[in-house]
């Protein structure tokens, strides 16, 4: 076993990478980087019936978008490849045969129909059928049959599987970095299939062999694999290999807190559960992705890091570098972590505030070009700086600042009713005439002069400022009104006031 920390993320290419998988990859990445180790990507594609075209590319693209690229894996050979299990399948039989020779595994010739019959018989008696020490001598396998019968079946190309021979009357002492010490009675374990009748290994065998050959020192994976921990420990022991350290991560739960977060939850409640958009190659259905929904990868990574872990302080905003320094497996929670879509938006809003204005202006300019709106880059940057604190996504810049680029095409009915009263049109006409006489349209000067004009009229500020906002914006929203007037300029300001008077009189 290598003294250097080596971890692996080993997804199956059966569809898009769920954010639960991204979190597993993230924790592996953080642990490896903290300890100066390697983060390995291995594609576990032994189940060819479930293989989905494009899924592997999606996984790699998703990791890169999140800023957690692998050090070693497909396309990044480092001497431990191949990194797709389908390309390693020839070696698995060799290891399965070693287990048979050492007495730790055996051939089983029971057909699916025969096993279904045994299950049915047990169910009728109120029992559960388990293929293990209790009944393996009564079943059709190389432990119950003579050597001649076994050889005859093998020579006759009869279908068979290879099963692990679980020990009887033993207490296994297991250790998990997150969950501590555990004990398992081997009498309750079944003899798991290690090699299938189609000539492909199961996850259990391929996983253990690959982890050993790739010198993986720490296996950090989801808690759904916790029931397999005993088998995996026994496999390491059967091969005479040192086992890596194991850490089983808690589930990501639905927002309500009950059950594992699923794709359906996202569809029903309107939030993504995938890092990138995914188009199903068969149905053509499109599932939303965080990237396409406008989230920054920094926000998604920060959110995922806190789904099951915390640094032990009040601080919640961590970039990748800070996460790497702070991350400890021992601080990962045992219990499930409830997913909160609003918390994700909260992280996103934080990171958009930190984003460089020039970058945001470039992104906003792309949106403006789609709307066939031309604007000076400096002007766009100034608008971005003014309304930045009001947005969560880049797309929000238009909703929060469209009036900097086009005049309102309509006026919000509810807001207009609230702001435009009897006599308002006459008052706004007077204001328009007054503004024509002002040459300096800078916000600070405008504020001083307009306030003076309102005071001279002996009326409340709301009677002028609310309808003025309706005229310039189209609704009772937006940043400082004098800034809006300064940005759009004197001519546009006068035109908008006149249009409001003509429309709302």
From Swiss-Prot:
Note whether Aminoacyl-tRNA synthetase occurs among the keywords: yes
EC no.?
Answer: 6.1.1.17
Q: Which GO terms describe its biological process?
A: glutamyl-tRNA aminoacylation
What HAMAP family does the database record attribute to this sequence?
Answer: Glu_tRNA_synth_type1
Give a short account of what the protein does: Catalyzes the attachment of glutamate to tRNA(Glu) in a two-step reaction: glutamate is first activated by ATP to form Glu-AMP and then transferred to the acceptor end of tRNA(Glu).
PANTHER family from the UniProt entry: GLUTAMATE--TRNA LIGASE, GLUTAMATE--TRNA LIGASE, MITOCHONDRIAL-RELATED
**UniProt name for this protein:** Glutamate--tRNA ligase
Say which species the protein is native to: Christiangramia forsetii (strain DSM 17595 / CGMCC 1.15422 / KT0803)
Q: Gene behind this chain? A: gltX
């Amino acid at each position: 076993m290598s003294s250097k920390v080596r971890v692996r993320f080993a997804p199956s290419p059966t569809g898009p990478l769920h954010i639960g998988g991204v979190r597993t990859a993230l924790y592996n990445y953080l642990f490896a980087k903290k300890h100066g180790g390697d983060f390995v990507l291995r594609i576990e594609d032994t189940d060819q019936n479930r293989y989905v075209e494009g899924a592997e590319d999606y996984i790699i693209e998703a990791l890169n978008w999140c800023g957690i690229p692998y050090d070693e894996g497909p396309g990044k050979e480092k001497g431990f490849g191949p990194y797709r299990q389908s390309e390693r399948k020839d070696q698995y039989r060799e290891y399965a045969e070693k287990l048979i020779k050492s007495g730790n595994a055996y051939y089983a010739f029971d057909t699916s129909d025969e096993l279904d019959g045994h299950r049915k018989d047990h169910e009728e008696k109120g029992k559960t059928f388990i293929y293990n020490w209790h009944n393996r001598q009564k079943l059709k396998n190389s432990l119950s049959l003579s050597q001649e019968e076994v050889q005859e079946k093998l020579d006759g190309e009869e279908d068979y599987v290879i099963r692990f021979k679980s020990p009887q009357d033993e207490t296994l002492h297991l250790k998990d970095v997150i969950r501590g010490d555990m004990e398992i009675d081997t009498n309750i374990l079944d003899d798991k299939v290690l090699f299938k009748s189609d000539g492909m290994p199961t996850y259990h065998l391929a996983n253990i062999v690959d982890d050993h050959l790739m010198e993986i020192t720490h296996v950090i994976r989801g808690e759904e694999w916790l029931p397999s921990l005993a088998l995996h420990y026994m496999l390491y022991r059967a091969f005479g290999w040192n086992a890596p350290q194991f850490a089983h991560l808690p589930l990501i739960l639905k927002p309500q807190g009950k059950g594992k977060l699923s794709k359906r939850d996202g569809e029903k409640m309107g939030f993504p559960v995938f890092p990138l958009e995914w188009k199903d190659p068969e149905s053509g259905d499109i599932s939303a992705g965080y990237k396409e929904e406008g989230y920054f990868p920094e926000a998604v990574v920060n959110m995922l890091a806190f789904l099951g872990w915390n640094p032990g302080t009040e601080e919640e905003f961590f970039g990748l570098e800070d996460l790497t320094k702070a991350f400890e497996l021992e601080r990962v929670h045992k219990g499930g972590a409830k997913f909160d879509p609003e918390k994700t938006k909260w992280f996103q809003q934080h990171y958009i505030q930190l984003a460089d204005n020039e970058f945001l202006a470039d992104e906003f300019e792309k949106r403006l070009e789609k709307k066939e709106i031309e604007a000076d880059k400096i002007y766009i940057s100034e608008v971005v700086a003014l309304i930045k604190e009001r947005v969560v996504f880049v797309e929000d810049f238009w909703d929060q600042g469209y009036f900097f680029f086009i005049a309102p095409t309509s006026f919000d009915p509810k807001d207009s009713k609230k702001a435009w009263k009897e006599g308002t049109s006459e008052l706004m006409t007077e204001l328009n005439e007054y503004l024509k006489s002002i040459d300096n349209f800078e916000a600070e000067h405008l504020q001083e002069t307009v306030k003076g004009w309102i005071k001279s009229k002996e009326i409340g500020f709301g009677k002028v400022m609310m309808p003025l906002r309706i005229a310039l914006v189209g609704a009772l929203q937006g940043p400082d009104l004098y800034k809006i007037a300064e940005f759009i300029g004197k001519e546009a300001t006068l035109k908008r006031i006149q249009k409001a008077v003509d429309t709302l009189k």
